[in-house]
């Protein structure tokens, strides 16, 4: 087969410029170090391609295989891996330093829904003016908030003052 690589990640057939290459047969056996022209003939006889697997090695390692099938398998694996990846969103719940108990209850119910859905939750208590002097109140609010939802979430990053906000990140509990 006379396939010229459209895939820039691999060097195939006549694109291999080295004089000698280490060849692995289509069955996985080592054929040793042979001239590139001879390796190309071997691949052509079997109606397969010579693909440089490690072009930077000395001598380069090449494998006799069906390149089209190989590329198809690679893209199939990539799609499968991409499909199995779970994208974790971070939802934010904002509280104020002077929040009332009922409002904390409503916000914690929203955070509970996010955690059950599998999202992480960033809980931020915003301080205005001189309220940062009373950061302990913010920590109390966050502790109270966490007590309401500790059955569905765990603290990933404990409460910490960042500028005028005290932030805590919660993650869903593992089942």
Swiss-Prot record:
Role played: IF-3 binds to the 30S ribosomal subunit and shifts the equilibrium between 70S ribosomes and their 50S and 30S subunits in favor of the free subunits, thus enhancing the availability of 30S subunits on which protein synthesis initiation begins.
HAMAP family: IF_3 (MF_00080)
Keywords: Cytoplasm, Initiation factor, Protein biosynthesis
Recorded GO MF terms: ribosome binding; translation initiation factor activity
Organism: Clostridium acetobutylicum (strain ATCC 824 / DSM 792 / JCM 1419 / IAM 19013 / LMG 5710 / NBRC 13948 / NRRL B-527 / VKM B-1787 / 2291 / W)
A GO-annotated cellular component: membrane
GO BP field: ribosome disassembly
Protein name listed in UniProt: Translation initiation factor IF-3
Sequence similarity: Belongs to the IF-3 family.
Disulfide bond entries: none
Pfam family of the protein (one): IF3_N
Keyword DNA-binding attributed: no
Keyword Hydrolase: no
Primary residence: cytoplasm
Entry's localization field: Cytoplasm
Assembly notes: Monomer.
Database matches in PROSITE patterns: IF3 (PS00938)
């Amino acid at each position: 087969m006379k396939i010229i690589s459209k895939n820039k990640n691999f060097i195939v057939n006549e694109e291999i410029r080295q004089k000698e290459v280490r060849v692995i047969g289509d069955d996985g056996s080592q054929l040793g170090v042979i001239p590139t022209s001879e390796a190309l003939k071997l691949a052509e006889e079997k109606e397969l391609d010579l693909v440089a697997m490690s072009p930077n090695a000395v001598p380069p390692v090449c494998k006799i295989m069906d390149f089209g099938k190989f590329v198809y398998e690679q893209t199939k694996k990539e799609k499968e891996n991409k499909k199995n990846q779970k994208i974790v969103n971070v939802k934010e719940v904002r509280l104020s330093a002077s929040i009332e108990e009922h409002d904390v209850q409503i916000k914690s119910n929203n955070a509970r829904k996010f955690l059950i859905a599998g999202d992480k939750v960033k809980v931020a208590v915003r301080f205005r003016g001189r309220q940062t002097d009373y950061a302990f109140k913010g920590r109390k609010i966050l502790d109270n908030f966490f007590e309401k939802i500790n059955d569905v979430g765990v603290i990933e990053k404990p409460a910490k003052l960042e500028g005028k906000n005290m932030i805590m990140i919660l993650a869903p509990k593992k089942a």
